[in-house]
């Protein structure tokens, strides 16, 4: 048996950052430390007024560009007719005489105006700050009524789909492992975890995920990463266990290689 110890950490940790500036108009009841949310759920909302006005302005400019294009198409058609009255082939007409550059400019203005509308729409959407995944808030930096600038961290969150435990293994520990443990065959290997939850001793079952394949300089150890799924809503073999909270310190053990010519002896009383 190989034993080690480690701390439960989230697999995914995120700083939620505002991409727009403005005053926070509302926050979710779940926007508190420990608040649990689902992917896509609204966490907070920045005042959208300036961005609504910007979108309206962009849409108005687009309508103006569309009107200008209609006008330019009519002038271009009239220029072609006037050229045809001369009796000369249309292929001999200068581009300026047919207003081709003006028509191209009007079409380009349409594309630019559409891009500005899309940009304004995206900015408006970003006033609604939603959860990127199912998770929990571990730190909040702002609250309702506060002005925030673009790039300001609003909160720190972590995902609750998986947690990981990094287990340091010394050379002595590694010598107890089988050759297959250093290959992809390691993945999914059962790892027993023991720790405290709600003041009581608890146990969980995890699965080996990967070796980090780097020797830590401080302790000359390699790290085995163990994964536990749905730690805050345990299922399967862990369905009767207490939630495995981020930050919990656990002791882990798993079966190593079988040693030949070794027998278990009963301890004398």
Describe every region a protein language model picked out.
Residues 2-61, 132, 136-144, 150-152, ...:
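Long, amphipathic coiled-coil "stalk"/hairpin helices in large membrane-associated assemblies
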Residues 36-42, 123, 130-176, 207-209, ...:
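Surface-exposed patches in structured soluble domains
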Residues 200-263, 267-268:
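Structural microfeature recognizing short secondary-structure transition sites
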Residues 2-3, 60, 64-68, 72, ...:
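Extended amphipathic alpha-helical segments
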Residues 1-3, 18, 130-131, 194-205, ...:
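Short coil-to-beta-strand transition motifs
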Residues 44, 51, 58, 85, ...:
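Amphipathic alpha-helical coiled-coil segments and their boundaries
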Residues 160, 179-205, 215-216:
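Low-complexity, intrinsically disordered
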């Amino acid at each position: 048996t190989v034993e080690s110890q480690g701390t439960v950490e989230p697999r995914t940790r995120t700083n939620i950052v505002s991409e727009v500036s403005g005053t926070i108009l509302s926050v979710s009841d779940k926007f508190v430390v420990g608040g649990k949310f689902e992917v896509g759920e609204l966490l907070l909302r920045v005042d959208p007024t300036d961005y609504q006005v910007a979108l309206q302005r962009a849409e108005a400019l687009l309508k103006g560009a569309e009107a200008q294009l209609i006008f330019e198409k009519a002038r271009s058609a009239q220029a072609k007719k006037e050229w045809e009255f001369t009796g000369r082939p249309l292929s001999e007409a200068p581009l300026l005489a047919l207003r081709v550059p003006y028509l191209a400019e009007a079409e380009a203005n349409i594309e630019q105006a559409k891009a500005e509308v899309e940009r304004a729409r995206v900015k408006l959407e970003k006033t609604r700050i939603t959860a990127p995944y199912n998770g929990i808030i571990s730190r909040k930096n702002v609250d309702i009524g506060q002005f925030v600038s673009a790039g300001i961290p609003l909160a720190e969150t972590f995902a609750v789909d998986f947690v990981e435990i990094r287990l340091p293994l010394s050379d002595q520990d590694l010598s107890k492992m089988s050759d297959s443990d250093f290959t992809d065959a390691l993945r999914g290997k059962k790892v027993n975890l023991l720790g405290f939850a709600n003041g009581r001793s608890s146990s969980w079952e995890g699965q080996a995920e990967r070796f980090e394949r780097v020797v830590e300089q401080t302790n000359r150890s390699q790290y085995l990463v163990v994964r536990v799924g749905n730690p805050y809503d345990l299922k399967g073999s862990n369905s009767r266990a207490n939630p495995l909270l981020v930050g919990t310190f656990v002791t882990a053990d798993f079966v190593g290689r079988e040693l030949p010519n070794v027998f278990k002896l009963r301890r004398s009383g």
